[in-house]
Amino acid sequence: MLAGEAEAGRLRIAPRCIMTGGETLGKAVRDRLVQVFGAQVRNSYGASEFLPIAWECPHGQLHVNEDWVLLEPVDEQMRPMPPGQRSHSVLLTNLANLVQPLIRYDMGDQVTWSGQRCSCGSALPVIEVRGRSDDVMQVPSQRRGETVSLLPLALCTVIEEECGVFDFQLRQHGPSTLV
């Protein structure tokens, strides 16, 4: 990570703004970038099939680039989700790619459509990205006798903030075994 190189004195840059994307940006990573570089940090949401789906505004909200994409949060039966409820997945229609159009492409991402206008003044819709559905770990609950869903962001937040470890891999070998 560039922050580590800057802390070690091997990288001397002073960016005004750092744009991130590719993975969910956790608070610990954001805070570290701000501390090391003293710059604004802005996240984006995209996919290999289309960049950018949404950009973070100065107020910390992700605004859907709806001039170029249609984004449809859906439940497990592919029915539209109302604002304020987390989707099972999201369907993407790319309005910009005339060579290889994507129409209602199931991305597998869990998002929540805000339904509220952002205080930054943008008319673009606001979403919260929770992560990829197939990245969610299912672990048994000792108390309730059912499974509990662990989102990658929740695990990353604890490991990054409590242990200061930013590069790691978890492997689930069984219902209750993480390595």
Go through the PLM ranges and name each one.
Residues M1-V179:
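Active-site glycine/GP-rich loop and adjacent strand/helix microenvironment
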